[in-house]
Amino acid sequence: METTAIIRGVHISAQKTRLVADLIRGKSVAQALNILTFSPKKAAVILKKAVESAIANAEHNDGADIDELKVTTIFVDKAQSMKRFSARAKGRGNRIEKQTCHITVKVGA
């Protein structure tokens, strides 16, 4: 039985988040949390919350044993980007896109 946790509209680019997501794909839950705890990246903190949420969902909804859970699937999708304006010299302006992403984590035995 797989249990899912989805976090939508996270303020970090999908490309940066995928780098960390690749580290924990297929690992046991304890090992994944250990990797994320000691990773210095911002995405690691966000992914750790997502994995912990998936564990809590599995325990509460399915009555799963935490020791047997693995990160079966994890993927990061690009979400809507926020358009911002940055003033430049001589009355010009540049558009800045602030990236967001959706994170989906599935845990199962």
From Swiss-Prot:
Family, per entry: Belongs to the universal ribosomal protein uL22 family.
A molecular function GO annotation: structural constituent of ribosome
Gene: rplV
One Gene Ontology biological process: translation
Protein name: Large ribosomal subunit protein uL22
NCBIfam families: rplV_bact
Any one GO cellular component localisation term in the record: cytosolic large ribosomal subunit
Lineage of origin: Bacteria, Pseudomonadati, Pseudomonadota, Betaproteobacteria, Burkholderiales
Keywords noted in UniProt: Ribonucleoprotein, Ribosomal protein, RNA-binding, rRNA-binding
